[in-house]
A protein has these predicted regions:
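Core helices of alpha-solenoid repeat scaffolds
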Residues: 93, 137-141, 184, 188, ...
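Asp-box/WD-like beta-propeller blade repeats and closely related beta-sheet repeat scaffolds
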Residues: 141-153
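Beta-rich interaction/scaffold domains
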Residues: 1-45
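Ser/Thr/Asn(+Pro)-rich, low-complexity disordered segments
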Residues: 43-47, 84-86, 94-95
């Protein structure tokens, strides 16, 4: 057993759990699985110094990613740096001013179909302490006043819009000509209506996905104890409680999460952000520890020496995995 054995152990556990109780008793080498799970947990615990992983990855991003940071699309890297108290290169804001000035339309939209472009920038710039109502003379909030526009991107659009609006406790703009004005209540209701029978959320289909479930929880977390959710407060609490149970149940026996059949770091990252938003410690809460391995342990098992994270265990350092992994650890440590 090594730190790279997670996929094999998870597959073996799935095969074992699919058997009837009678058939399980016939598996002569079942103790090998149990011992492998315990050994894996010990290896992960002994090999990982989580705070060091967080610090070294932050150093790596600051030192090596200046070119990546100085462009639209690097918002998750910027968000992690800004929220961790590190410096964001000045070139990033200059690049954003240029991008906004070249792409924004008369309705304040950076993209005709993706409201998340506005939302992501609002999240990043708010974390930097920038004025999102005056980026090269343009107000990024304006587009988020139109519910139809937000809902064009379905679940993702609504999640990001709510996160963006709440990141600075922003008032929602009144958009002239909008058929349906956006409100926080309408965005929350959309998420509640989209919750699946199993208690989670999915980009498509009727089975919960860890990433979308975690992201929906992130968006609803601020309303868990009512806030301005009004009469929806009770419904939000019930929905989030169900989702937390679902996320706990989806965790693999090696502490991680699978998406489309692959054990990966990004799913673990999203779950960590969701749990910290609720005040749940993802490293110590028993619901998110399997065979001694927490979801934070799982994320850190994808760490690449020198800083950064892999997408999958046998992969190379990955930009998206690194951005989300660092952002997740920032949410955990801040």
């Amino acid at each position: 057993v090594t730190k790279d054995s997670a996929d094999k152990i998870t597959a073996a556990r799935k095969a074992y759990d699919s058997l009837s109780q009678a058939d399980k008793g016939k598996v002569s080498n079942r103790n090998t699985l149990f011992e492998a799970e315990r050994a894996y947990a010990t290896i992960i615990k002994n090999n990982q110094k989580k705070l060091d992983i967080y610090t070294i990855t932050g150093d790596y991003i600051e030192k090596d990613d200046d070119e990546k940071l100085a462009a639209f699309g690097s918002e998750w890297l910027v968000l992690g740096l800004a929220r961790s108290g590190r410096d964001v290169p000045g070139e990033y804001y200059k690049a954003i001013e240029k991008y906004v000035d070249e792409h924004i339309d008369g309705s304040g939209r950076l993209d005709a179909k993706r409201s998340s472009d506005n939302s992501r920038l609002i999240l990043a710039l708010t974390a930097m302490g920038r004025d999102v109502t005056d980026v090269a003379g343009h107000d990024l909030l304006t587009a988020l006043g139109d519910l139809d526009y937000i809902e064009k991107q379905s679940l993702s659009g609504v999640i990001y819009a709510l996160l963006a609006l709440d990141s600075g406790d922003y008032e929602i703009s009144v958009v002239e000509g909008a058929a349906i004005p956006a409100t926080r209540e309408a965005l929350i209701q959309y998420l509640l209506d989209a919750q699946l029978e199993d208690g989670g959320w999915a980009f498509s289909g009727d089975e919960a996905e860890p990433d979308m479930t975690a992201m929906a929880v992130q968006a609803l977390a601020g309303y868990y104890e009512a806030k301005p959710a009004g009469k929806l407060g009770k419904d939000v609490k019930e929905a989030v409680d169900k989702a937390v149970d679902v996320l706990s149940g989806m965790q693999t026996t090696t502490g991680g999460y699978e998406s489309y059949g692959d054990l990966n770091s990004e799913s673990a990252s999203q779950v960590i952000v969701a749990l910290t938003a609720l005040g749940i410690d993802p490293d110590t809460d028993s619901r998110f520890i399997k065979n001694g391995v927490s979801v934070v342990d799982s994320l850190c098992s994808f760490y690449v020496d020198g800083g950064g994270f892999r997408h999958v265990m046998d992969g190379e350092r990955d930009n998206i995995a690194t951005a989300q992994g660092y952002y997740a650890l920032t949410a955990y440590y801040r």
